[in-house]
Amino acid sequence: MLNYDIAVIGGGIAGYCAALNAIEAGKKTVLISQGQSALHFSSGSIDVMAKTPSGERVEAPFSAMASLPQQHPEHPYSKMLPNFVRQSLYWLVDQLKEQGLPLHCQQDESNHYRITPLGTLKATWLSQPFVYQHRQNVAFKRLLFVAVDGYRDFQPLLAKDNLKKHPDFQHCEIGEIQVTIPGCEALRRNPNELRSIDIARLLKQPQAFNSLCHQLMKHATQEDLVIMPAIMGNGDGLVLLQQLRRQTNLTLHEVPTMPPSLLGIRIEEALQKRFLKQGGVLLKGDQVLSGEWDEQGHLTSISTRNLGDIPLHAQAYILASGSYFSQGLKASLDKIVEPIFGLDMVAKPHRRQWRNDQFFSASAHPFMAFGVETDAMFRPSLNGQVCQNLYCCGSVLSGYDPVFEGSGGGVAVSTALAAVQRAMGLKQAMSVEEECVL
């Protein structure tokens, strides 16, 4: 029999934030993760709110949250005060800074815009050190996209053409630098076979790294913004980027590419290392299969694939299993379910109602806001009965569309901390109704 204070199910950003917050509070914590999370496919920036659920553009996300409880009471942000969301994000900044991964926001706490791999602009709130935070004015003489010979996951010509169409960049010269990484030929059998991890390994070698520096300095100046794919990582990406900046004296902008995203991997590795450093127990490569309940709606234990018939007990459980991509939600032809416990869902009954007629619709597809139904304490229900010691956070929640709104990171971090605080309140025998909104 295994006993913990808090058991966290899911190893994405919500799961690690919940587990870290519990560890900080002195709770004996275990995190069960199936393996690589959606962070391997993420931009590495933390979006808080780029649009309201009705589609209105947001510049100041915390101000926009104030109206959500009246207009969209089902939204996860409506169950927390804006200041709690803000404090949660700064808590994440502190955690990652301790692991050598600083994140930065604007001084006025408004959104900034990052240049995407497609040459578009996307609103976000926290970005990594080598992400150019665009507001409106462009201080660079030229923007130069770096094309790596043999690298298939970044198309600078497409990005360049799209960025030229944006009004903020129409006065800028936008060009391209073609570079070759020594050693690539030995790794590929086809003309365009290299992935970011392959190039990251090569750039650890001084010859390859110095060659890249020389090629960049040959074409770029200090007046330019050099836009390059995220090809430095594998544990020391920021160290190499800092070295690249020192040797070239250039202003660099990293863009995430097709998976694996080295920017996202940096965040996952930093959170995992911090959790283990703080004394957390990580069951990686394991899967929670089911749970046992008592008559009052308490989850008494969970079973995992690797533990077999050994139950895992906790005072409180945090479900951070993710959405469709992470299999926290599963869709069949006629229904959408939460597969571990079979929790009550918010979802339209007929498949025809799951989507809009047009794929590229101006409004959000309904299925993206489907998820587990929770009360003001982020507690789900099972067959109509409230689960007394199970709390949900992150993209398993219903009531919001993280893609349409650009709110995935903010919801994940803030609901993770809210779930843990409410779980600890339960353990400390607080009244369930004592405080519904932190």
Swiss-Prot record:
Reactions it catalyzes: a quinone + sn-glycerol 3-phosphate = dihydroxyacetone phosphate + a quinol
Record keywords, A-Z: Flavoprotein, FMN, Oxidoreductase
Cofactor: FMN
Gene Ontology MF term list: glycerol-3-phosphate dehydrogenase (quinone) activity
EC number: 1.1.5.3
GO biological process terms held by the UniProt record: glycerol catabolic process
SUPFAM superfamilies, per database record: FAD/NAD(P)-binding domain
GO cellular component: glycerol-3-phosphate dehydrogenase (FAD) complex
A Pfam family it matches: FAD_binding_2
UniProt pathway: Polyol metabolism; glycerol degradation via glycerol kinase pathway; glycerone phosphate from sn-glycerol 3-phosphate (anaerobic route): step 1/1
Domain of life: Bacteria
HAMAP family documented for this protein: Glycerol3P_GlpB (MF_00753)
Family: Belongs to the anaerobic G-3-P dehydrogenase subunit B family.
Described function: Conversion of glycerol 3-phosphate to dihydroxyacetone. Uses fumarate or nitrate as electron acceptor.
Assembly, per entry: Composed of a catalytic GlpA/B dimer and of membrane bound GlpC.
Name of the protein this chain belongs to: Anaerobic glycerol-3-phosphate dehydrogenase subunit B
Classification of source organism: Bacteria, Pseudomonadati, Pseudomonadota, Gammaproteobacteria, Vibrionales
